[in-house]
Amino acid sequence: MLLFFRTYLIISLSLNLGMVLVSPAILKKKIEGRPLLDQALKILEKNAEVQSYLTMANVMAVQRLLYNDHGPVHSRIVAGAALQILDIMLDDGFIPSIVRDGVGDEEDSRLVVMMGAYLHDIGNAVHRSYHHVTGAALAARFLPKILRKIYQDPQKAYRLTAEILHCILSHDEEVMALSLEAGIVKVADGVDMAEGRARMPYKQGKYDIHALSALAIRRVEIVEGRSGDRPVRIVVDMDNEAGIFQIEEVLGKKIKSSSIARYVEVEALRRGEPFRVIRF
């Protein structure tokens, strides 16, 4: 109970100060007062097919490959982080691609970001290789049915299906994101790199640079940028310099192919003290 209260207090203080600690708690906070997002999340969380794929994603990634978490917790973290990045960019005057291109409105953009982020890793249920392609193929089977429960207009449901599939396919660092929404999902995927995500493979005996560098990351926060041209600032607090590998090789590659790289900067801290500012 004390641990729960402490976590809740940290999240609340961070939100009040304009800082958001990357954790599973973000998602619940970001959908408050948004019926469309709340409905969509409830459908996803109760959908047997979706939850089975997310469970199997961890069987494949964590148990068989000794990778870090790619299951339900990671999905919630990325979905919440993506909504936070979107809100920062909206507050800075950015127009979502979905709005600009006449596909939907701002709330539809939020839904695409949340669902794309939540579902981005389901392809790992089949195999890590080409999981972004497999994930899009799997999601194409059930997304229209889910969206038809939310939208009365079937054409809009299919248009938003395509946008969500683009987010899933584009989250791989080798694929360029072509929408603001997909770029945000990709960056949000990269910010889930704190030590908690690496605990499972580490406990199973994985001691490579990926595991050790992830264990060096103490916490990650998403905040408003200090400079006008970089509205999104990702603050990464490390125990030691090993964490730079995570920033450059994991997060950095995501940012570079996100199509929003010029609006994002990463501030690396070492035990709370300024260490380096990185722009990709």
Where are the predicted features?
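N-terminal low-complexity or amphipathic/hydrophobic leaders
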Residues: 57-77
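Post-HEXXH active-site segment of zinc metalloproteases
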Residues: 130-140
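Short, positively charged and aromatic/hydrophobic N-terminal segments
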Residues: 3, 7-18
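Inter-helical turn/loop segments and adjacent helix faces that build the functional surface
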Residues: 145-157, 175
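Divalent metal-dependent phosphate-bond-processing catalytic cores, especially two-metal-ion Mg2+/Mn2+ enzymes
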Residues: 17-46, 64-69, 80-107, 119, ...
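N-terminal glycine-rich anion-binding loops that anchor highly charged ligand groups
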Residues: 46-57
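Secondary-structure capping and boundary motifs in well-ordered enzyme cores
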Residues: 70-74, 104-111, 131, 160
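Active-site alpha-helix of zinc metalloproteases
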Residues: 112-116
